[in-house]
Amino acid sequence: MTDQEIIALWEAGQQERAFNEIVRNYSERLYWHVRRFVCSHEDTDDLLQEIFSKIWAALPSFRGEAQLFAWLYRIATNETLNYLRKQKVRASLRFQSLDAAMERRIDEDPYFNGTEAQRLLTKAIARLPEKQRIVFSLRYYEEMKYEDIAAITGTSVGALKASYHIAYEKLKAEFQDLV
């Protein structure tokens, strides 16, 4: 079902069916979007429940000014960033680096089934600053256009291109050291 059909269902009073279609169409994509930042299967599942709860609560205010997928990704991204900020505060209270904790989670994650190179890339991306990590993940993994990322993040296309380039150069430099 297309996003336009989902919106039409919602507007026709079939809110529950429309929401179920959103969950069906976007669960996996949003899961992997969140997982790239959270690095834990269990935390991602918990966060996804919160995200879909926020989506359900916010759907009546969706005005169609943005594409549905961009609106959903924006909610998911904002909730994920809020979660990471809370984790960072908790980590600082425990005198431990959030980056180090995320790297440890990647190493210990029983659900990670990638190669060693993928594990190293995931860890390197986790060390990028928040904005660069978001832009790189959406562009590289989700293969989104800069215009769509701009709609999700509320950032200009030029700034996104610069962030992506800087992230790419940092990752390239890190992997050149390994070769």
Task: Set out the residue ranges of the language-model regions.
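Internal acidic/polar
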Residues: D3-Q4, R90-T115
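N-terminal module of bacterial RNA polymerase sigma factors
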Residues: M1-R29, R36, A126, D148, ...
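C-terminal edge and immediately downstream basic/flexible tail or linker adjoining helix-turn-helix-like DNA-binding
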Residues: L9-W10, S92, Q96, L120-K123, ...
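Structural recognition of an alpha-helix C-terminal capping motif at a helix-to-coil junction
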Residues: W32, D46-S53, A66-N78
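Residues within the DNA-recognition helix of helix-turn-helix
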Residues: Y26, S163-I166
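Arg/Lys-rich amphipathic alpha helix in sigma70-family domain 2
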Residues: S61-R63, R74-F95
